[in-house]
């Protein structure tokens, strides 16, 4: 039934540990995700790997197949395209759209941080957090931790700490640079965590 059927959609550009491996090689990962839906939630899921990296083509394709699904799970789509793809599909479809690499990861990190802070007797506002990676997961982790009231977050990408004015950042990174790194630290990860 439509209400119990989810499309697991990927273009294979950001497969965990493998990177941009393309749609054919990504299929076993999507099949595995579909099995997890069935095993743990009794939700039927259908893996779909698209042979395009074009944002508009992905959005249009998902919109065209959406009427037969109860939800869309976006999977392993590289940043920064994944942000626009998810945002637009949420705006344009009347079914749930979820990008697992962003939100699933952020939820797990937030849960771990809540418990870690309990163990050390700190509040969210007192925490100083460094996030290594400013792609889809890192940006989403940062957004969720900001909603939880974390006091200071520094996002670090391969080119360094996100700080306003850096020309190399994409739009999502620029947004986070304005909301984080209150001391305007610069440099690579080893310099930030010292």
Regions found by a protein language model. Name each.
Residues 1-95:
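N-terminal ligand-binding/catalytic initiation module
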Residues 16, 21-41, 93, 99, ...:
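Glycine-rich phosphate/diphosphate-binding loop of Rossmann-like nucleotide-binding domains
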